[in-house]
Structures are given as structure tokens and as C-alpha cells.
């Protein structure tokens, strides 16, 4: 009986195992080919050649992070995809380049203020259930429409605080400088 129950439960895992295998294969090939390094170095060279560095670069990275957040729900999955390319790219783009801590702080800002706007947020169904306590017609569209002003306000304030922080040259924490190399 136990063996049959275990076999039945593993039958449901087949699609996940195949997906995990494909994802692991993609990650291994990405690492083996050094494609992340090639994209990062080429991207940094391109950014420097067109003079796109400094605060506009950080601001753009925040917006890219926010845009990707609308389509990829997991923060750790987004960081796993973005970090191998963007951390070295922003470290190399500009003199001095941004430290990994600064890049991650910018990523977290972009990731944070669009969370409530994506239906991929794991807690979105819970938000809808709570909203329907007060408005039975509340749904995905009405929740997103209601949250846009809050999200935009939170995003603008967060970005401004971060950019002022960078302009003042304040460290992000003990031993966490803004720029690569201190």
C-alpha cells in the first residue's frame, strides 16, 4: 500500500522533475558558455561608449527590475536571472563602477514597488479575498487599478531617497560602499 501511494504521489511530480531538469540544464549551459560574462562585459562596454553611466544607469536598472517583476513573481528567481549579468555589468560600467551591494539595493527597490501590481504575487489571491469582504465586486483589475497610485507614489519616493543617498555618497551599511573598490 505504501509503495503504491508513494508511486501515485511521484506521478504528480513528473512535470516538475522535467521542468527542474530543463532549468538546471539551461543554468549549467549558461555558466559553461560564459554567456553571462560575455553579455555583462559587452553591455558595460556599450554603456560606457554611449556615456550611459551614473544615476541615469541606476534609475534605468530600477525600472528594468520593476518591469521584470511584473512577469516573474519570485524575487529570488529574478535575482538569479539578473545578477550574473547586471552585477558585473554595473561594476564595469563607469569609473568607478557600482558595488554589488548598490546593484542589489537598486534591484530591491524596483522589485518592491511593483509587487502589488502583478497578479503573480503569491499573496494576490489573499488580497482579493480580503478586498471582497468590503466590496464583493473586487477582482484582479479593480485591485490593480486601486493600487497603481500607491505603487507609483512608493516607487517615486523610494527612487528619490535612493538617488539622494547615492548623490550624498553614503555607504549602504558597514563595509558596503556604493562604488566598486570603495
Stretch-by-stretch model annotation:
Residues 28-37, 68-81, 114-122:
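Short helix-coil transition sites and intra-membrane helix breaks within transmembrane domains
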Residues 55, 94-106, 135-146:
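Membrane-interface alpha-helices at helix entry/exit sites of multi-pass transporters
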Residues 20-28, 58-69, 150-167:
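Hydrophobic core segments of alpha-helical transmembrane domains in multi-pass membrane transport
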Amino acid at each position: 500500500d505504501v509503495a503504491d501511494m508513494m508511486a501515485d504521489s511521484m506521478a504528480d511530480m513528473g512535470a516538475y522533475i522535467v521542468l527542474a531538469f530543463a532549468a538546471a540544464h539551461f543554468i549549467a549551459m549558461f555558466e559553461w558558455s560564459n554567456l553571462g560574462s560575455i553579455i555583462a562585459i559587452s553591455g558595460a562596454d556599450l554603456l560606457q561608449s554611449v556615456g550611459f553611466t551614473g544615476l541615469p544607469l541606476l534609475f534605468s536598472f530600477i525600472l528594468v527590475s520593476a518591469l521584470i517583476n511584473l512577469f516573474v513573481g519570485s524575487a529570488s528567481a529574478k535575482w538569479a536571472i539578473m545578477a550574473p549579468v547586471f552585477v558585473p555589468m554595473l561594476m564595469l560600467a563607469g569609473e568607478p563602477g557600482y558595488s554589488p551591494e548598490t546593484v542589489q539595493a537598486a534591484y530591491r527597490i524596483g522589485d518592491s514597488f511593483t509587487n502589488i501590481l502583478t497578479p503573480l504575487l503569491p499573496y494576490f489571491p489573499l488580497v482579493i479575498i480580503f478586498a471582497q469582504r468590503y466590496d464583493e465586486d473586487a477582482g484582479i483589475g479593480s485591485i490593480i487599478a486601486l493600487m497603481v497610485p500607491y505603487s507609483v507614489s512608493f516607487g517615486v519616493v523610494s527612487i528619490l531617497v535612493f538617488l539622494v543617498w547615492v548623490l550624498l555618497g553614503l555607504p549602504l551599511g558597514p563595509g558596503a560602499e556604493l562604488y566598486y573598490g570603495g
